[in-house]
Amino acid sequence: MKFIDLFAGLGGFHLALSNQGHKCVYACEIEKSLRDYYFQNFEIYPEGDITKIDIEKIPNHDILCAGFPCQPFSKAGNSKGFKHQVAGKMFFYLLKIIKTHNPKFLFLENVPNLIAHDKGRTWDFMKKKIMKLGYQIDQKIISPLDFNVPQTRDRLYIVAKKNELNGFKWPDKLKPKNNLKNYLSKNPKVLRKITEKREIVINTWKYFLSKIPKNNYLPNPLWTMEFGATYPYKDKTPHSMKLTDLQKLKGKFGVSFKNMTKQEIFENIPNYAKVRTKTFPDWKIRMIRRTREFYTINKKWVDKVLPKIIALEFEAYQKLEWNCQGDKFNLLKKIISFRGSGVRIRRNHSSPTLISASTSQVPYLAWKKRYLSLDECLKIQGFDKLKYYPPTVDKFYPAIGNAVNVKVISKIAKNLFS
């Protein structure tokens, strides 16, 4: 069958469908450099801005594929949805194309949060619009992990067929395998080396973890700024208090507020506690309470390590997310991600999600003392046969992070089009 590839990126839909004998007759991608790579790989030069194309001139096709922009609905983005100035409007251009060309199949991809966005109203609206054009629609959240690809990457996959789906079944999950090692290269193309500052972060947390008594519980996340803090968090917030009352308390790392101005006090409160609200949400209260309880129990040895943590450059480096409960506290056998929410540690079974928003969050393989390499990212995303792609950090990681996973697309396509 003939298909079109909208918001094409590196061409994940193209790779998956063409490998099954389908023919791409049209593509669209707004970024110039990715259009160039698409042409080099597939000998089709994509159109640019979808809002400026002549919809009538799009060739007839049986399948419409689109990984339409996810930032408006993403938790990692700003979740503005249809209010997003540009990207939030892309769905309506898709509708125009569908209405004009009436393809037999629709195959779409987006972030899982699309389902929950605006309390489900956004997805309900979109689904009804597609159904109104005569399609039966189904959707499911799937991760490459479901098919033994070592990447945690939940995405929403949407399939639709004119009139009815005729017994379409989503592909079955496979028995999990801890197989990241099979995707690692002997001669990796490492685009970036870890900075000296991040090495200090790793060594600091390595030292901290080595001091934790055996069988001790480690809260996740651990917000070390709460060590020694006494500002209120259960039924009130610093913002809701009078200056004279705050001056009797302590801020991050036990800094006394005595004789401080309100501005000075807020400079010594963690960023997450500076919000202008009278009460914190339950989840934040829980995180703060757990960290303070941990400190109370472990104060004697923690205070000896604390100066090293305080010396770390950013607040994000002072927060630890240990996603390995039950494991030995051995940092050097784990995968490390430097995120805005903290230093995230996970088991070495699979890669965390490759994201487009930041090149700073590329997974670091502590036992290899390097970041996940360019060729390994390509293999995990199913692009290992791709000949041409961005060669630099600032271009490659956003492109691969935005791409659909080729193996997942292939699995669904096989069931949908067979």
Summary of predicted features, one role per range:
Residues 2-108, 112-124:
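Core alpha/beta nucleotide-donor-binding catalytic domains of modification enzymes
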Residues 14, 71-75, 114-117, 148-152, ...:
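Short catalytic/ligand-binding loop motif for oxyanion handling, primarily in non-cytosolic enzymes
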Residues 47-49, 135-146:
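Conserved S-adenosyl-L-methionine
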Residues 121-137:
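Conserved Class I S-adenosyl-L-methionine
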Residues 138, 152-156, 350:
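Residues that flank catalytic or metal-binding motifs in active/ligand-binding sites
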Residues 149-231:
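Flexible, glycine-/basic-rich loop-and-beta segments that form/coincide
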Residues 223-418:
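C-terminal target-recognition/interaction regions appended to catalytic cores
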